[in-house]
Amino acid sequence: MIEAAAYILIGGQSRRFGSPKWKARIGNETVLNRILYSCKEFETQQLVGKYRPSKYKVPFIQDKHKIQAPIIGLHTALQQSKHDWNLIISCDLPLMTNSIMDRLWGKRKTGSDVIIPVVNDMLQTTCAFYHRKLLDLCKAGIQNNMLSLNDLVRASTYIEVDFSDQTDAFLNMNTKEDLVSIKKKLL
């Protein structure tokens, strides 16, 4: 069991994708179901977004900010969380696995604020553990219109975890073409 909360970001306008990404299907399951399965070891799982998805019994937190940015979802999650550590994961990572979650969780250290995967020298900010003590820094970023999660991470004490051996798990699904490519990886 991972003694943390998993917050799945389902918001976003999905302009390039054309419809809510969490509804996209891979085989006989939705992308959201795949993400929920990858988070099955967490004490709690919650969805964060503008609108509650129908047909899901997973607890939902409505994001009330008008701004569309992952830092808004992080802020909403940290405000609600009763856990010190909180996974923030975007619903556009349909190849994510629970073994990656376990590996990340195993790297936490006292005094750190963020445990973050790195793939091809890029921080994977929408699949990382954030400590609840970042709430004030997150709030200040939003108030100052500094909405970059990369900037937030770099302003904190963070642990990088190299996932160059599992780059496919971090393939981001932004377009229908991305979805086709991801489906091909599963064949």
Which residue stretches match the model-derived regions?
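Nucleotide and nucleotide-moiety/phosphate-recognizing core
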Residues: M1-M146, D151-F170, K176-E177, K183-L187
